Amino acid sequence: MEVQAKLKFARISAQKCRLVADQIRGLPVEQAINLLTFSNKKAAVLIKGVLNSAVANAEHNDGMDVDSLVVSTIFVDEGPTMKRFEARAKGRGNRILKRTSHITVKVAEKK
């Protein structure tokens, strides 16, 4: 049985977040949390929070054993993009795209 947790509208691009997500896919939860703790990326902090939430959901709602959990599925989808204006020289302007993403983590017990 899979238990999931989601973080929606995270202020990080999906491309940057997927770099970290790909590292922990399929790992045992304890090893994944250890890897995320010592990563220097902003996405690692966000994903670690979602992973901890998924583990808490599994333990509280379904009574699963935390030590036997594995990151079965993790994916990052693009959220809406906020468009901002940046003034440039000679009356011009550039558009800045502030990207967001939706992070979904699913954990399951080892088979």
UniProtKB/Swiss-Prot annotation:
Biological process according to GO: translation
InterPro entries: Ribosomal_uL22, Ribosomal_uL22_bac/chlpt-type, Ribosomal_uL22_bac/org-type, Ribosomal_uL22_CS, Ribosomal_uL22_sf
GO molecular function: rRNA binding; structural constituent of ribosome
Tagged with keyword Ribonucleoprotein: yes
This protein's UniProt keywords: Ribonucleoprotein, Ribosomal protein, RNA-binding, rRNA-binding
A single Gene Ontology CC term: cytosolic large ribosomal subunit
Record bears the keyword Ribosomal protein: yes
Function: This protein binds specifically to 23S rRNA; its binding is stimulated by other ribosomal proteins, e.g. L4, L17, and L20. It is important during the early stages of 50S assembly. It makes multiple contacts with different domains of the 23S rRNA in the assembled 50S subunit and ribosome. The globular domain of the protein is located near the polypeptide exit tunnel on the outside of the subunit, while an extended beta-hairpin is found that lines the wall of the exit tunnel in the center of the 70S ribosome.
Family recorded in the similarity comment: Belongs to the universal ribosomal protein uL22 family.
Subunit architecture: Part of the 50S ribosomal subunit.
Name of protein: Large ribosomal subunit protein uL22
